[in-house]
Amino acid sequence: MTPSMTDSAVKAAMAVIASSPATTQEKIEMLIEMAQGFQKKPKTAQDLWNAVSLCHQAHELCAEDNLLWKARAKAGMATALKAIPDVGEQLLLEAKQRLEEALPILQRTLASTEGTSAQQYPQQFASAEEVAEAQMNLGLVLQSLVPFNLARMTDSIQAYQKALQVFTWQKYPQEYAILHNNIAIAYLSMPLTSEKESLRQGLAVQTFEEALKHIRLINHPREYAMLQNNLGNALQYLPSSHPLENILQAIAAYDEALKVRDPKDTPLEYANTISNKANALFSLPDNPEKPEAGNLKNMQQARAYYQEAWEIFTQHGQIEQAEVVVHMLQEVETEIGKS
């Protein structure tokens, strides 16, 4: 693919680099560094297309024997392609191809670094972190391709697990948390027979709980809230002989997430969590020891949460989520009317 969606400012910067007296290797490094700048905090999809173009230009400048930097350019293109909003299957397939071409080269150059620091010689050697990041991105791409029936979830999980060999909780807690979150969601998404349903959901719960042994609220609040919210979802729908206990644990997990998520600083995440908590409250008896007494109080609290979530989703243009919440709001109104 030759990128065509490059804005004029980036084209001008590419032209300046091309005409500069820098060496070809220096130009390649400048282009990839610029691309990484666009990828780190993209404001629009255009920033990601710019990153694709810059990596493509870097790849074109690489000589045939400059395999490591060709691989880095390919990995950079893939990272940008997978992050483009509403990305379709064709761009995901291209990202997959780029990563599958880059990974063997990164792994080979990593294998030759025994006794040598990749940080000392970045032009010659890949780092373990580079390889792990490529594995993590491959896992994300494969997971995104599963709904198109173009990849297997087991391959996605395998890629994540390879990345975890480097991204340990001691050194890379944020990546560790994200990888565990993605693995757990992958388990929840696997199409298994009904008798294996509880197994995959149980694996997801275990994966979230394992990550939360190391990801603490005080040190990594954002990742902590993400894991607690998704643990709540897994617990809420976990097939069990004691569903009431699971719902109570799910609500406790949502409450942990809400220690971080609030309507001012993280409105969409907050709305997501309170709507999840409302789902749990909807079916929770007011007095778990006397379920026959009903759950009017909890349904009223659920209604308040749904209403607040709907207002936030609508305000931020999240139409699909708003429609889901409206449907649940109508259901709870109907049930309250019967009480």
Where are the predicted features?
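Short coil/turn connectors between adjacent alpha-helices in alpha-solenoid helical repeat scaffolds
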Residues: 2-5, 37-50, 81-97, 142-155, ...
